[in-house]
Amino acid sequence: MERLPLLLTNDDGVNSPGLLNLASALNRLGHPILVIAPLKEQSASGMKLTLRNGMKFQEHKELAKSIKINKDSDLRIFSLDGTPCDCVIVALDGGLNKITPEISPSLCISGINRGPNLSVDIFHSGTVSAAREASLYGLPSICVSLATYSHENYSDSISCTLQIVDTVSRLLPIKPPNLLRPEGSKMKFANKELTSVQNSFLLGDIFLNINVPEVWNGEIQTVNLGARWYQNASDMMSNDLNEVTFHVGAATIIEEEIENTDCVSIKNGYASITPLASWPQSHPLGLSNKLIEEALEYNIKTGLPSWL
């Protein structure tokens, strides 16, 4: 079986263990891997772009060598002194294909992030935003987060990700049919034999947000976003010179107990998968409520979306 070439990125930076351990595990399975990640941590950067300054770009050959297991599969690692979305744009539409012609990605994986990306987190997260950016460019995408700060053991998150990548690989062609969106908003179907939801994923109009709990029970649930509220989210401080500074970071996080949501799944030890629309609903490529509901239908045995 030919393994899909993969684009990996994140918001924790090129040296983060979640990214490197995942890249190594995927390389072991034979996936050609192209990593382009921020040089420095870019957590909570959202969809920020670097527009006024040049960004340093470099290859990390020794780093790639240190994690490469499968000598027959390509693995190249680059960093960009920019944001996660900058990295995706450079990878897909910035001429990187001239530097790495041997790796043409079929799927983008953003992560594995340290910390949860649940509920409202998706709007701030650089990890989620990188996956969304790739999908906007027509590349099928997923993002993965370890939903805790209490440890950095990514073994469960990697196992879950490998299971999902294996399932997704059965659906995706080697060559993404809508990469760079050559027909703009006109392409509605990549394959008329597939369902509307499957086509939406292939075209980059739906992407998957995955969270794995602190201790995983080995099961997956396909669920909605939950209701998560950050309270006392800023802290004001002053010094003897009457200079005032603010620090943003919630002192209290409240999660509502709503069934079939990512917050509750994670609390109960399940990994959560939430299909997300890439575009606002009012956009020409925005998804109908019916299609989003279909995207949330799941296989009772596996917990995965039933359309995968």
Language-model segment annotations:
Residues 9, 36-38, 110-113, 143-145, ...:
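Short beta-strand segments
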